[in-house]
Regions:
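Amphipathic alpha-helical interface elements
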Residues: 33-129
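Regulatory/sensor and coupling segments of signal-transduction and defense proteins
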Residues: 78, 124-125, 129-139, 159-160
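Conserved non-transmembrane functional hotspots
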Residues: 211-223
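Charged, helix-rich terminal subdomains or tails
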Residues: 14-16, 25-26, 106-110, 114, ...
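Charge-enriched, short contiguous segments at helix-coil
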Residues: 137-212
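Charged alpha-helical initiation segments
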Residues: 1-56
C-alpha cells in the first residue's frame, strides 16, 4: 500500500520518499510544505514518536538538534538580534559566527561584547547552543524563557545528553528525572512543545499529525479487507 510506504518513509525522515510514493495520489500526510519548516516540524514530531516508544536513549541522544532548533528560533523571534546566521560565514555546510560579521552592526557589536566577556576574546567558530544561551540570557525579555525553559534545555544537554552520547548505558525516566528534575514526557510536553509554540515553530494542531496519519492508515487497511 502506497500510504503505508509513505508513512514508513516519513518515520525515516525521508521526504523524497514520501513525495515520490504519494505524487499520484490524493494523500497529503506532511503538514509543513516549505523545506526548512518541514524539516524542523518533522524532526520535533519524530522525537515525540521515539518518546512514545519509550526509547529514552534515542530520545535523549536526539535532544541536541532539537535544542539548536529551539534556541535559534528564540534568538530570531524573541530578541532584537534576529537570525543568528546573519552574523555567520558559511564554510562548506557549517555556519561560523565571526567577529567580522558581528562588528558590522550595533546589535552585533553588543553580542560580540557578551561573547568577549564570557570567552576572554571570542574567536571565530561554529556557533553552538552555549553561544545561543548567552545571547538569550542577555537579549531576551521573556523571563519564563530565560529562567525556566532555557535552563532545562541546556541542563538536558550538559548533564544528560552529552555524558551518554558516546557510551553504552541504559536510560530510563528515573535517570532522566534524577539529572534534570523532570521526566522525558514532561521535557517534551511542557518544555519542547511550549517553546516551539511560543516561537511560532509549531501550531497546536500539528502535534496530532501522526495520529491523523495513523487513523487514515487504519481506515484504508479496513477498506482493503
Amino acid at each position: 500500500m502506497k500510504l503505508l510506504n509513505a508513512a514508513e518513509g516519513r518515520w525515516r525522515l525521508d521526504y523524497n520518499c514520501v513525495a515520490n510514493v504519494l505524487k499520484d495520489t490524493e494523500y497529503d500526510i506532511i503538514p509543513a510544505k516549505k523545506k526548512e519548516e518541514r524539516e524542523i516540524t518533522e524532526y520535533l514530531l519524530w522525537l515525540g514518536i521515539i518518546l512514545g516508544k519509550r526509547d529514552y536513549l534515542s530520545f535523549i541522544r536526539g535532544i541536541t538538534p532539537a535544542a539548536m532548533i529551539l534556541l535559534e528560533k528564540i534568538v530570531e523571534t524573541l530578541t532584537e538580534v534576529g537570525d543568528i546566521k546573519k552574523y555567520c560565514e558559511k564554510r562548506k555546510d557549517t555556519y561560523w559566527l565571526t567577529r567580522n560579521k558581528l562588528e558590522q552592526s550595533e546589535i552585533g557589536k553588543e553580542v560580540l561584547d557578551v561573547l568577549d566577556k564570557r570567552y576572554g576574546e571570542f574567536t571565530d567558530c561554529i556557533y553552538t547552543t552555549a553561544h545561543l544561551e548567552l545571547i538569550i540570557k542577555e537579549f531576551c525579555s521573556d523571563d519564563k524563557i530565560k529562567s525556566h525553559y532555557l535552563k532545562i534545555i541546556r541542563k538536558t544537554e550538559t548533564e544528560l545528553r552529552n555524558p551518554i552520547a558516546h557510551t553504552i548505558v541504559a536510560v530510563d525516566n528515573g535517570m532522566i528525572k534524577n539529572r534534570i528534575g523532570i521526566t522525558a514526557e514532561e521535557l517534551y510536553n511542557d518544555v519542547i512543545k511550549k517553546v516551539a509554540e511560543s516561537v511560532r515553530l509549531m501550531k497546536k494542531s500539528t502535534w496530532n499529525s501522526y495520529d491523523e496519519m495513523n487513523k487514515l492508515l487504519i481506515e484504508k487497511v479496513r477498506e482493503v479487507k
